[in-house]
Amino acid sequence: MNFRRMLCAAIVLTIVLSIMLPSTVFALEDKSPKLPDYKNDLLYERTFDEGLCFPWHTCEDSGGKCDFAVVDVPGEPGNKAFRLTVIDKGQNKWSVQMRHRGITLEQGHTYTVRFTIWSDKSCRVYAKIGQMGEPYTEYWNNNWNPFNLTPGQKLTVEQNFTMNYPTDDTCEFTFHLGGELAAGTPYYVYLDDVSLYDPRFVKPVEYVLPQPDVRVNQVGYLPFAKKYATVVSSSTSPLKWQLLNSANQVVLEGNTIPKGLDKDSQDYVHWIDFSNFKTEGKGYYFKLPTVNSDTNYSHPFDISADIYSKMKFDALAFFYHKRSGIPIEMPYAGGEQWTRPAGHIGVAPNKGDTNVPTWPQDDEYAGRPQKYYTKDVTGGWYDAGDHGKYVVNGGIAVWTLMNMYERAKIRGIANQGAYKDGGMNIPERNNGYPDILDEARWEIEFFKKMQVTEKEDPSIAGMVHHKIHDFRWTALGMLPHEDPQPRYLRPVSTAATLNFAATLAQSARLWKDYDPTFAADCLEKAEIAWQAALKHPDIYAEYTPGSGGPGGGPYNDDYVGDEFYWAACELYVTTGKDEYKNYLMNSPHYLEMPAKMGENGGANGEDNGLWGCFTWGTTQGLGTITLALVENGLPSADIQKARNNIAKAADKWLENIEEQGYRLPIKQAEDERGGYPWGSNSFILNQMIVMGYAYDFTGNSKYLDGMQDGMSYLLGRNGLDQSYVTGYGERPLQNPHDRFWTPQTSKKFPAPPPGIIAGGPNSRFEDPTITAAVKKDTPPQKCYIDHTDSWSTNEITINWNAPFAWVTAYLDEIDLITPPGGVDPEEPEVIYGDCNGDGKVNSTDAVALKRYILRSGISINTDNADVNADGRVNSTDLAILKRYILKEIDVLPHK
């Protein structure tokens, strides 16, 4: 119904209540005369008149397919309703659902259920209020009777029930429309004026953290780094800014640089460049003294050399938490709330992973035919928010961790931090091996179990199963040891086999000096896999119902030339054999580092047109990094070309940064879908790995600056003022899509540990929650919701946390390394006279210096401006600079 809405959320700076529903969606109160008082209603959306339906959303299961929208009700101007389109009824009544989650029913309370529902075809609808997951207890369900709908006739239902069970915070209000309930498809079902009323319940006040006008890295900045903030303002003139310390004293001031409309966020923005301020301290913040708004400030942040010192260990700890087949326990878990029993070790109710069969051939999702056999595939890492274990996703993740170690070893810092024995908080610490290799080995040992033996199937011996996962999807709020689903092996794939060959070859060379027996076994199995892939070069993991199945992600890949190149690179660097050298040198991907995937072919179909260098499905860049990093027998000119290609790709991303209002290295995709893709944050992280290598190989600090910009975007300098990392920032990630760390599902589950990064904005609307909560015309950078049900924007995965760990470690440890021919990043090159930092010395620098001396609020590079090198910037420097520009002085500094 169409009624005036009023804001009901109290705005309190500095306090954020972790709640299930995003304030931008639920904070508006309807005043419908048809419904009871909003504040006593357990539902947050009742009338749909604002054009959104969240937290109502749909669910598809067991063959069901549907779509939904909020639409105008014909013949009722101003009235809107939630419309569900049943496209395929599926096998069961729950195959198609519309539902509202996040409901707590309290014992002894009496509730009034009310809704109006209608359809354009004769059908039935089963409505219930009950548990979201096992055992699916129902507290109200119209006495188990579905409602009959007559075409075009509205049915209004009003019933009471008393909660006679213990208080339950895992409830949902659900309508089932599939299976035997459905009409002939397609058809529409409409819902409006829906309520769940309890006069004893009062909606809590939700405290909403305002978005400040000045967006910053909410954690902080390294002292030597380039430092930018982004100001949201439609002003076309520079704005005065002040930087204050924790004592509220102004320590620096200047004027913003207007940039105009930022395409990806649709914000009008300015930049603040405060790179020359290097004084370490905590609690700095910006103010805009001439801007008359309640949000003319920034969040507090630090300037410190140890910004990433703890974060890198938190990022690495994610992998211990995601281990399968081992109890997660203290003192390694970081807190008792994050401990759990071992998952999938063949103990009831688990049905894996000690004796997992190939996928049942009589199942509709069987896919490629397989012989029947069983395998022990215990161990490894759970991939993401589910309990699946996927070789291609595990491949790039474990490569990234091992590459961290290999780079550290080559750069001479493998004797400290996570690289040394005892450096990480894991059970294997102090066992004589580098801890990060111990963690990687947990995945490598699992990989070995996924390889097909001669006994199992001689026709594909040496090939590797693409993945192992549940037969059907499980609900959120389920620990691994509670998973009751049967688990099966999906068919082998060439991509998985080459991931296996690449990472086991990499593992072999890193372990040869620590555990020669293990290293030799890795290499033997890697070479067997290589030969198997050559024999079966086109077993693709296709995106079909058989390949994806209902219990795990598909990870489809229809091109494997990149994986062949990557595997050949790793095998060649490890063995030096001509077989691999000849293969990689004849590959179309030889020495390639994509700046935008698919430009030269060779990208997984899903990656074509996306800015970035590599993903689980596009892997040639990994091989090129190995060739550029590790000593090998390639011609020196080729190795230099690989390094140059790495720098060239990074240069293109630096150009993107200068074009983007929030200074990030990706832009909207250049494919038919455009916008930001699933896991957009991970594209930035992988770009930052390449930027790190560009700095290693060139010594040019501009690549370090690019890494700083990427981190600042991820940690809050973005269109949503969102830190996408748990435990870090004023507005951190709180509700990732995960089956254990899901307090939105139930209070009995813990909030996530710190150091986990979410996939981030995805403008392709690939889950019902984001589709229900965010309008389709929302700018790409703002297509995100911090909600546990939004798997397409808020998922967490091993292949995203791996580059996050890589980058945070790199930035934390960069002061330990000076790259060949480079400069110490703490002592950046001084270009005397270049006051405005544009790389040139001319009259504009004299103007900038004069304005600075006259205290006109301009920021300059004071190191460059001190042209007589006396440690001060004053009128003497201005006089010398003018003489230099007039060619009266030949060299600066001039004393």
Swiss-Prot record:
Enzyme Commission number(s): 3.2.1.91
UniProt cross-references to InterPro entries, sorted A to Z: 6-hairpin_glycosidase_sf, 6hp_glycosidase-like_sf, Cellulase_Ig-like, CenC_carb-bd, Dockerin_1_rpt, Dockerin_dom, Dockerin_dom_sf, Galactose-bd-like_sf
Chief subcellular location equals secreted
**GO cellular component labels:** extracellular region
> Taking every annotated instance into account, which residue ranges of this chain make up the domain Dockerin?
828-894
What gene is behind this protein? celK
The CBM-cenC domain covers 40-199
Segment Catalytic: which positions? 241-815
Q: Which organism is it from?
A: Acetivibrio thermocellus (strain ATCC 27405 / DSM 1237 / JCM 9322 / NBRC 103400 / NCIMB 10682 / NRRL B-4536 / VPI 7372)
Biological process according to GO: cellulose catabolic process
Residue segments, region Linker: 199-240
GO molecular function terms here? cellulase activity; cellulose 1,4-beta-cellobiosidase activity
The record's annotation in Pfam families points to:
CBM_4_9, CelD_N, Dockerin_1, Glyco_hydro_9
Q: Which reaction does it catalyse?
A: Hydrolysis of (1->4)-beta-D-glucosidic linkages in cellulose and cellotetraose, releasing cellobiose from the non-reducing ends of the chains
Q: Which CDD domains match?
A: Dockerin_I, E_set_Cellulase_N
- Report the PANTHER family cross-referenced here: ENDO-1,4-BETA-GLUCANASE (PTHR22298)
List UniProt keywords, sorted A-Z.
Carbohydrate metabolism, Cellulose degradation, Glycosidase, Hydrolase, Polysaccharide degradation, Secreted, Signal
What's the superkingdom here? Answer: Bacteria
SUPFAM superfamilies per the UniProt record, alphabetical: E set domains, Galactose-binding domain-like, Six-hairpin glycosidases, Type I dockerin domain
Q: Which residues form the signal peptide?
A: 1-27
- Enumerate the subcellular locations listed in this protein's record, separating them with semicolons: Secreted
The active site lies at: D386 (nucleophile), H737, D786, E795
Q: Know the name of this protein?
A: Cellulose 1,4-beta-cellobiosidase
* Family statement: Belongs to the glycosyl hydrolase 9 (cellulase E) family.
